[in-house]
């Protein structure tokens, strides 16, 4: 929008558009701000038409383009945009908008139906209209609520007086479990009575049914007339399609259990209730159990309109699709849609999973690029930095990973407490991958002066010393090293007393289970008294000091960083709480 010197309209309207534009740029996730901007652009110059100024029309198009790039699943706004283009520039411009909209939300029954209706009114070449209906049918024909689309398709063929094509459509539809399945069957049955036998069923089926009728009459020595034979064949055909109806009825009833619980079948920026997510999970479970690939895919696509901001369903879709043969590109497209449109970078898990997928497919440079793209937005994200370093380790060896850590530790863009966590992973690589305990220990010793306030640093160092293998002869020496880590942590770190006590519990466990000598329990009791005794004997026992003087405490914001716990995104996967109620947060 900044490319335009004027937005069209009066000075007052220009001022309002500038203000609304600023609000959108300040908070691009605000749906309300976007709606206000689009409405203001629509009302420029008293309402836009083909006689409006080029500036006003450009402003309108720019606002819609940006809005629908941000929220591409808003089928109603695609329809409004197409209507506006039709009024402003005619059918070709409107058709371009419909094409963009249907590419953005491929499974919208409403949008495809509107597009087909538009095509019916503006195109008089029958095969072009039918081609569009068939395209639409591949995307929305299986939808449980697809009846408006099929009604529109039948309406078009009625206008063409193409009874054979109406019959063919109905013959398809009666096999689809959907909300209004029964009325399609009734119409199909009535129409089939007026169609030639050769148009009702395939030639091989017709031959089989004729043979059955003749075989049934043969034992009685009866030779039926052609009219009688046709009557009996039609009765068999009617029974055959009644079986189809009953199957469709049964399949519809099964799905109604889940369909009836869907309260919001369209996209919106607000959260859903836990009960809605639970229903989608159960519905997907059902279709996967049924095993029809097309129906499963269609349901996932429906689900990911309603649940677009819930990354659990993107993960699920990608995992399911990856279990199907020869679906690498389809899986890639699922990840691309998730990361480019719906899941914010502040929740990097789906992006990391995408990177792992690309690495597994041999596209290592793409996997590296995904990590780098996340880090441009989240330079302090420990999980992503560690993931990137381990990607380099897998592809380039241990030194490549350590160089990656060193580069991040040296970067001014990385927070002090993030660096502390990275140092611990550097040490762990030396210990567990290279097998060098002394090099790993030196990393802790050489960095303690910088990261003494980091919980993650002390946790890692303490675990490192606790996990060293020992013998009866070396346990005492090992115990001294552990004791020194505990004493250093208590006296040098400005972490909260609660966090220090949490780490000291590890030492109490060690003393009880592996402590050596008569003084092990004395150390246990001394530490227990200082941790849990009354204030008269425990006061200031966990206060950091320098030259005997207490050090100042960390402010609250710094303390939260210093004492942060770090996790991998995949540690949070698990069964959803079936008892959860209320609104389900996106994250």
Features from the language model and the residues they span:
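Alpha-helical solenoid scaffolds in eukaryotic macromolecular assemblies
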Residues: 1-587
């Amino acid at each position: 929008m900044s490319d335009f010197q004027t937005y069209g309209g009066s000075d007052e309207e220009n001022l309002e558009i500038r203000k609304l534009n600023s609000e959108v740029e300040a908070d691009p996730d605000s749906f309300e701000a976007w709606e206000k901007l689009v409405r203001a652009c629509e009302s420029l110059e008293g309402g836009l038409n083909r006689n409006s100024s080029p500036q006003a029309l450009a402003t309108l198009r720019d606002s819609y383009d940006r809005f629908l790039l941000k929220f591409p699943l808003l089928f109603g706004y695609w329809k409004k945009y197409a209507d506006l283009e039709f009024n402003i520039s005619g059918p070709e411009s409107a058709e371009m908008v419909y094409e963009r909209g249907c590419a953005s939300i491929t499974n919208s029954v409403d949008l495809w139906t509107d597009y087909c209706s538009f095509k019916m009114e503006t195109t008089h070449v029958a095969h072009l209209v039918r081609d569009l209906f068939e395209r639409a049918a591949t995307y929305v024909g299986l939808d449980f609520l697809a009846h408006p689309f099929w009604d529109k398709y039948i309406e078009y063929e009625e206008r063409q007086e193409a009874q054979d094509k109406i019959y063919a459509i109905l013959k398809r539809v009666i096999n689809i479990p959907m909300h209004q399945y029964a009325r399609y069957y009734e119409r199909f049955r009535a129409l089939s009575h007026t169609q030639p036998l050769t148009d009702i069923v395939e030639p091989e089926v017709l031959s089989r049914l004729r043979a059955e009728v003749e075989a049934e009459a043969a034992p009685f020595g009866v030779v039926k007339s052609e009219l009688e034979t046709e009557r009996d064949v039609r009765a068999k055909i009617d029974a055959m399609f009644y079986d189809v109806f009953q199957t469709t009825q049964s399949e519809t009833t099964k799905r109604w259990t889940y369909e009836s619980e869907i309260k919001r079948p369209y996209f919106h920026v607000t959260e859903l209730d836990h009960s809605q997510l639970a229903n989608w999970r159960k519905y997907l479970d059902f279709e996967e159990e049924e095993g029809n690939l097309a129906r499963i895919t269609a349901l996932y696509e429906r689900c990911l309109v309603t649940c677009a901001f819930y990354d659990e369903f993107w993960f699920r879709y990608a995992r399911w699709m990856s279990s199907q043969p020869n679906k690498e590109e389809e899986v890639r497209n699922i990840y691309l849609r998730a990361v480019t449109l719906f899941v914010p970078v502040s929740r990097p898990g789906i992006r990391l999973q995408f990177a792992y997928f690309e690495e597994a497919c041999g596209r290592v440079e793409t996997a590296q690029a995904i990590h780098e793209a996340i880090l441009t937005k989240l330079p302090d994200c420990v999980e992503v930095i560690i993931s990137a370093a381990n990607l380099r380790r897998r592809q380039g060896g241990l030194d490549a990973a350590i160089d990656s850590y060193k580069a991040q530790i040296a970067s001014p863009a990385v927070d002090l407490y993030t660096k502390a966590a990275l140092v611990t992973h550097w040490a762990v690589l030396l210990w567990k991958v290279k097998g060098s305990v002394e090099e790993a220990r030196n990393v802790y010793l050489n960095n303690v002066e910088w990261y003494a306030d980091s919980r993650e640093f002390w946790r890692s160092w303490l675990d490192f010393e606790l996990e060293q293998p020992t013998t009866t002869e070396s346990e005492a020496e090992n115990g001294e090293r552990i004791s020194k880590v505990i004493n250093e942590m208590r006296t040098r770190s400005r972490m909260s007393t609660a966090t220090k006590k949490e780490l000291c519990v590890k030492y109490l466990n060690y003393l009880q289970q592996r402590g050596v000598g008569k003084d092990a329990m004395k150390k246990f009791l001394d530490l227990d008294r200082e941790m849990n005794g009354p204030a008269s004997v425990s006061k200031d026992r966990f206060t950091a000091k320098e030259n005997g003087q207490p050090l100042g405490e960390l402010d609250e914001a710094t303390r939260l960083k210093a004492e942060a716990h770090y996790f991998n995104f995949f540690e949070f996967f698990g069964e959803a709480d079936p008892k959860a109620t209320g609104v389900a947060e996106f994250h």
